[in-house]
Every structure is written in structure tokens, then in C-alpha cells.
Amino acid sequence: MGEKEEVKLLGVWYSPYAIRPKIALRLKSVDYDYVEENLFGSKSELLLKSNPVHKKVPVLLHNNKPIVESLNIVEYIDETWNSSAPSILPSHPYDRALARFWSDFVDNKWFPALRMAAITKSEDAKAKAMEEVEEGLLQLEDAFVSISKGKPFFGGEAIGFMDICFGSFVVLLKAREKFKAEKLLDESKTPSLCKWADRFLSDETVKNVAPEIEKVAEFLQELEVRAQSAASRS
């Protein structure tokens, strides 16, 4: 693409959303500078300037032009460095539509239920949210079997758009298993998805950018302690 370009990624180390562009950039062999934002402190001027609407990570800066929202960033990376490595999005329009549909399902239906189960104080609300989480995993199991057609990933032989989207939450699920003794990916219910998750975490691209499961589990415990402390003061 001619002269050397400036690529910078603003993120938070544990964020599933920040993992997504990291994977995409590595798949495309793009060199970039990473800037870690302070989760509990003041947001940087660069972040506030780059994403004034939502004021959150991740943000990709490409030659000082900001691109926001994690999956939007992944698509941008795929289209901008389209001569580097295979396409992240499927080549066929129908397959692209499926990948976007299931990615939207993960972000706007499945993960909100998981988040609700984690933060609600109501046992009834937690039970209802966990039902939605488990039902969603069954639906994703069926989607994987249908879309992968016996291949290792949603994207076929290699990690693709939907793998990046849902895979970004696998570390969080594994961390919850350690922190809460809560096994959501169950071999007896979602066998194909469980094998896919192991393959995803074992992929060299993912291993190089994903946070350590133990470290995330410790961080989740720290967050719970903070929440309990705040609740006791209110």
C-alpha cells in the first residue's frame, strides 16, 4: 500500500471487544502500536478525541483516522488490507449475511444475557438470564454445525468473522469456569462448539493476542470485590 502507514489500536487488556481487532490485525500481518487505556482512571485525551460519541475502546487509528466499534474495525481491516492473507469475511454474499447475522446475535442477544446473569442481584432475573445464555449456546451449536460444514471453524479451514466475534468471549467463558465453577460450554450439550472453542484458543494467532485465562479470572474476582464494596457503602 505504498509508503509506511501509521496504525494504532486503543484497547483494554481483558476486553473481548479489543481482542477482535488484535486477531484481525495479526491475521493480516499488520504492524501496529497498541495503547492500553486505564479502565478505572480517567480516559485519555486520545480516546475522547477519537471516539467522542461512545468514549470507549476499541478504537483503530489508521493514519490518524479513527474507526470505532469492534466488528466495524474488523471489517475495515479486512477490506483495507485485502491483499494480505485470506479474507476474514466470507466471499459469498449469503455467507457474509449469515456471519453478520450470527455476530449480531452474539453481541446483541447472547452476551447481554450473560452480562445480566453476572450483575443482577435478583435470583429470578439471574435464572432467566442463564436460561437465555444456555439457549443461545444451543443455537450457536446448531449454527456452527450448519455453517462450518465439518470444517474446523465458522470460517471454514481458517478463522473468520464469526470466529473472531464469538471467539473473543471464549476466554471470558473459561475464566468464569475457574472463578464461578460455572461450566457454560458443556460437552454433553454443545460438543461441536466445545471442540471449536479449544481449537480457537489453540490457534497461534489467538494465543499471541488473547489474555491469560487465569489473569482474567483474577480480574473478574477483583471486579466482584469492588462491586460488593461499593454496594456496602451505598
Curated annotation (Swiss-Prot):
Q: What induces it?
A: By the fungal pathogen Verticillium dahliae.
Q: Which CDD domains has this protein been placed in?
A: GST_C_Tau (cd03185), GST_N_Tau (cd03058)
Report the record's Gene Ontology biological process terms: glutathione metabolic process; toxin catabolic process
Q: Which reaction does it catalyse?
A: RX + glutathione = an S-substituted glutathione + a halide anion + H(+)
The GO terms this record gives for MF are: glutathione transferase activity
**Cellular location(s):** Cytoplasm, Cytosol
Could you state one GO cellular component term attached to this entry? cytosol
Major enzyme class:
transferase
Q: Which PROSITE patterns match?
A: GST_CTER, GST_NTER
Protein name stated in the entry: Glutathione S-transferase U16
UniProt organism field: Arabidopsis thaliana (Mouse-ear cress)
Taxon lineage: Eukaryota, Viridiplantae, Streptophyta, Embryophyta, Tracheophyta
The gene for this chain is: GSTU16
